[in-house]
Amino acid sequence: TMLDLSMGLFSRARVRFVERLRSLKLYLLIGLIAAALAGANLLHLFDPISILTRTCAVLLYPLTVLFANLSLDVLRPAARGLGWISLAYLNFDQPLFSTALLTAVIFTGIVMLNLITPRFWCRYLCPLGALLGLLSRFGIFKRVVNSRCSCCAKCQAACPMGAITDDPRTVKAAECLQCRTCRVICPAEAISFKAVYSPFREDATLSVDMRRREFLLACSGGLAAGYLFTADPLRKARPDTLIRPPGAIPEKDFLTACIRCGACMKACITNTLQPSLFDCGVGGLFTPKALLRYAACEQTCNLCGQVCPTQAIRNLDLEEKKYAKMGTAVILKEKCLVWEQDKACLICDEQCPYNAIVFKMVDGVRRPFVLENKCNGCGFCENKCPVEGGAAIVVMPLGEMRLAEGSYHAAAQASELTLEEEKGYDDFILEGEGPGPVKSTD
C-alpha cells in the first residue's frame, strides 16, 4: 500500500526489465533460509513486514507526534481565550530514536526504486513475495477471462506487478497480487476472480528459470553470510553499556528470535528502549537496548513484553518483570562527586526504588556503595545522576537474569536477590564511624 501511494509521485515513464530479474527475490529467499540454517537471522534486512513496522515505529510515529504537538501549539492561544484549559496545556511526549535517519534512508530508497519500475521491490527483491509465489499454486481464487475479452491489453498495462503475459487472457499466478485492478479497468467486464478447488493449479508455476548453479550459489551465499554474522568478533565482545529489555531471553536466542520490528521501542512509555547499531556486531543491528542515561525503566510498565510478536522479550506480569534483573549499577569513583570531590550528594540513593545504595564512612566522608543483591538494573540512579555527560553510576549487564522459560521470581530467590521497597529508615552507615541510621524522607 505504501508503494502504491508513492507511485503517484513519479513519472509514468518506466524502464522495462527483463523477466530474468524476477528470480532475484527467489535467490534472496533461498539465501535467507540458508543463513537461518547457519544460525543467523537476517530476515529483518529484507522482510517487508519488519521493515514497515520498524519504519512506522522509529520514523513515522515520532513524526506524527511532532505534527500533533505543532498543531496543538497553533491552537493554544485560541484554547486559552475560550477557557479550554485541558486543550491549552495538552502535550504529547515526543519520542526520539537514534536510528531514525538510517531508517528514513532505507525506506526512501525502497520508495525511490519506483522510479525504475512500478513496485520494483515487490517484483524483484521481496523474499516474502517469492514465498507467497511458491504457495500460490495452492491458492483458492483464480483469474478468469471470458469470451468478451477483446485483447485490448489495458489490463496488461495497468497491472502493478506485470503479471499479465503478452496474451492478456493469461497471468503468471505466482506474480499476481489478486488486487483486482485488471477487473476494474477492463472495458468489456470480461475479467473475474472465482474460487477453484484444484490443490495444484497449472497457472501457478513459478515464473523464473532457476539453474542448478544459481541455486547452489544462493545456498552457499546464504551459508557464508550466516557464518560471517555468527562469527563476528563483536558479537561476543558485548560492550558493558548494552542493556537488554527486562524479560529478554538469553542473548544468542534473543538475536535469533528478534525480528527488529520496533514494536517494543514504540510501546516503551519512557522512550528508554532504543535501536542498536553495531553495539554487538552486524547481527545486533536494530535490536532493542535500554538507554538508561536517557530514561530509566519504569517499574510499573511491562508493555515491551506484551507487544513482542516473537517473545524475544517475554510477556511477564509486573511482579515477575521486577525480578527480571537487567544488570547491576556500578559506581565510577573517578567521576562520582562524593568519591572524587568529597561533595555531599545523595541523588542515586534517593532515586533507587529498592534502597540498593548505602553509604559507608571512608576517610571521614560518607561514600556510596551498591548492594548487588538489591539492584535490578532499573537505571533510575544512572538517569538522575547530576554529573555532566556520562553518569558516575552506570548499569552494566553484570548479574543480568535472562531466562528462556521458568519463573524469574524463583530464580531471584535462588540467587538471593531481594527487591522489596523498604520504608522508614535507610541504613546509610554500615561500617566504620559515624552517626546511626538517618530517617528517610520518603
Kindly label every feature range from the protein language model.
Residues T1-E175, R180-D442:
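Non-ligating segments of multi-cofactor redox enzymes
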